[in-house]
């Protein structure tokens, strides 16, 4: 029963952490009045493209987040849980190599400690990101509306 609940909690937690990173993109889109509907595809790339020329500081921060190993591990685990076979269980799947070779073998599951570390690290990264974004938005409004 404990493994079941841990797996369930891990799935939900990783899904929500990733979703919160994505929600901030919608906040940024609204902040700059980009007119992108929340259901449109490629919203992240469209927002980042806009920021590249219009807000270099936020652009750099988002690029740094996307290349962060903690973010990448969290995203990878979340995608596996959502779209593939669970990394929380031992499994046997084909592995496709660039050379065209296909190999088979048993892939070990991630340990509870590994999953817990990914969740904790991801939450810390999300907190840092939200703190940065909050200060950035505050500065945005000060510059936009507090013209003395």
Go through the PLM ranges and name each one.
Residues 20:
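Short, positively charged
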């Amino acid at each position: 029963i404990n493994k079941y609940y841990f797996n369930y909690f891990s799935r939900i937690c990783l899904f929500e952490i990733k979703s919160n990173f994505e929600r901030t993109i919608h906040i940024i889109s609204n902040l700059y009045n980009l007119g992108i509907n929340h259901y449109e595809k490629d919203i992240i790339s469209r927002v980042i493209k806009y920021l590249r020329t219009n807000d270099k500081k936020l652009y750099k921060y988002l690029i740094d987040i996307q290349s962060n190993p903690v973010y990448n591990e969290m995203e990878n685990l979340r995608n596996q849980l959502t779209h593939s076979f669970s990394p929380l269980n031992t499994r046997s799947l084909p592995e496709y190599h660039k050379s065209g070779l296909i190999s088979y073998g048993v892939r070990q599951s991630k340990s509870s400690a590994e999953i817990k570390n990914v969740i904790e690290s991801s939450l810390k990264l999300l907190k840092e990101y939200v703190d940065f974004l909050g200060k950035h938005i505050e500065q945005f409004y000060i510059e936009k509306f507090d013209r003395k």
